[in-house]
């Protein structure tokens, strides 16, 4: 699992590194070198391919400028595009000028014509305009910067698209919560220094980030254990999966029961059943209204079907008892309620009857409430205390707002 940090945590880590003997300059050089290495690999180590670096006035821009100088030493021909003129006493800027590599300044670029030209020539665009200190919620990108980022994003419409690499975080994204300016850079990859920032994993910002590449810049390793947030990657989940014994059979891997379905939404419960079977459950049982059984059984020969009694187009009052008996008979380990169930007075009573009867069924390892079951929950008084079995809920923002 990878540790992720907030802006304040990152600033604190950098401060700790400096206190322990690492200079701010050393941290910048490490970041700039890492950025240059990623840029070099992105263009396939072909110096003739254009590398455009967009340089802002802050620390993020400094990292980009150091990367430009390093690329020059390796034989590349970078083009630096400055958001505004830099201090003539800046050593990195002096070094770049002395290399006689090309550059332009946005404030001197009439109608951004020079930018348009180099954007179309570039195989790689490095976004080093703004870093993690930028908060677009409080201070949106200004008109001039927005014009630059819009044109960067428009290169995605080119026949031959350049690769867009952002340093630490794409310009226009809040590093803590993923809030995104309408004109934020849409990166193909983001190299993030020290630890990945929380906003890289939060939507809507996540859509603009691309591949996340954390790199070490020499922060103290003894502080890692105090960082509370971390990601869980799909590849890492395999370590949590129990090994399947060679003598296993369907009874080894437990029973999943899925409750839901209606005339309007017969497909939802079928998809859930198919997913449960593919995920490795030993046995899958679907409890759905009897009048849609034919729609579900076709194509699912490996699933057990428990028809729920109906009156007309609605579930019968005895449907909940049928579900509970099915749970008992198969000693269900995992119960999913909700896919395609529908939201009516009848289904509300149905879900309530099931939920309030689960605590005495010790064989249940967990209950998942999804879709229409989540819409029904707010109508059930003290639902969270009535359900003692371990619970997983899967609300989208609208459903979550009703639950709260």
Task: Please provide the spans of the model-predicted regions.
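Small-residue (G/A/S/T)-rich helix-start motifs and N-terminal tracts that mark the onset
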Residues: 1-83, 189, 200-371, 375-404
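Nucleotide and nucleotide-moiety/phosphate-recognizing core
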Residues: 37-131, 135-167, 350, 356-366, ...
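Short beta->alpha connector loops
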Residues: 85, 108-110, 171-173, 196-198, ...
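Short low-complexity, flexible loop/linker segments enriched in glycine and/or proline
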Residues: 94-96, 180, 299-303
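Structural alpha-helical scaffold elements that stabilize or flank donor/cofactor-binding regions
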Residues: 118, 183, 326-329
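Internal gly/pro-rich beta-alpha loop/helix module
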Residues: 123-124, 129-228
């Amino acid at each position: 699992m990878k540790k992720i940090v907030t802006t304040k945590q990152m600033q604190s880590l950098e401060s700790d590194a400096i206190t322990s003997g690492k200079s701010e300059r050393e941290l910048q050089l490490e970041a700039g070198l890492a950025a240059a290495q990623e840029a070099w690999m992105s263009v396939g180590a072909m110096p003739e391919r254009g590398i455009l670096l967009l340089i802002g006035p802050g620390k993020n821009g400094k990292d980009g400028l150091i990367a430009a100088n390093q690329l020059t030493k390796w034989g590349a021909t970078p083009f630096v595009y400055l958001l505004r003129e830099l201090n003539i006493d800046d050593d990195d800027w002096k070094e770049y000028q002395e290399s006689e590599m090309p550059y332009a300044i946005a404030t001197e670029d009439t109608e951004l014509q020079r930018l348009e030209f180099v954007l179309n020539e570039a195989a790689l665009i490095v976004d080093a305009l703004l870093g993690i200190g930028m908060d677009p919620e409080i201070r949106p990108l200004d008109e001039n910067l927005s014009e630059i980022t819009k044109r960067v994003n428009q290169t995605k419409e080119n026949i031959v698209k350049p690769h867009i690499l952002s340093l630490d975080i794409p310009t226009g994204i809040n590093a803590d919560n993923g809030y995104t300016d309408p004109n934020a850079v849409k990166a193909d990859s983001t190299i993030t220094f020290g630890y990945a920032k929380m906003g890289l994993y939060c939507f809507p910002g996540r859509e603009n980030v691309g591949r996340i590449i954390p790199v070490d810049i020499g922060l103290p390793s003894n502080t890692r254990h105090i960082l509370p947030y971390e990601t869980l990657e799909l590849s890492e989940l395999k370590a949590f999966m129990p090994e399947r014994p060679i003598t296993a059979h369907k009874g080894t891997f437990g029973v999943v029961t899925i409750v839901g379905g209606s005339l309007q939404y017969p497909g939802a419960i079928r998809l859930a059943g198919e997913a449960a079977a593919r995920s490795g459950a030993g046995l899958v049982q679907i409890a759905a209204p009897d009048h849609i059984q034919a729609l579900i059984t076709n194509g699912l020969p490996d699933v057990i079907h428990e028809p729920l009694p109906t009156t007309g187009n609605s579930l019968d009052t005895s449907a909940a008892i049928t579900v509970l008996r099915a749970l008992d008979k198969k000693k269900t380990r995992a119960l999913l309620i909700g896919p395609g169930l529908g939201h009516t007075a009848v289904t509300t009573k149905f879900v309530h009857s099931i939920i309030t009867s689960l605590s005495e069924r010790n064989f249940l390892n967990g209950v998942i409430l999804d879709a229409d079951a989540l819409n029904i929950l707010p109508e059930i008084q003290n639902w969270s205390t009535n359900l003692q079995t371990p619970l997983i809920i899967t609300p989208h923002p609208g459903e979550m707002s009703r639950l709260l």
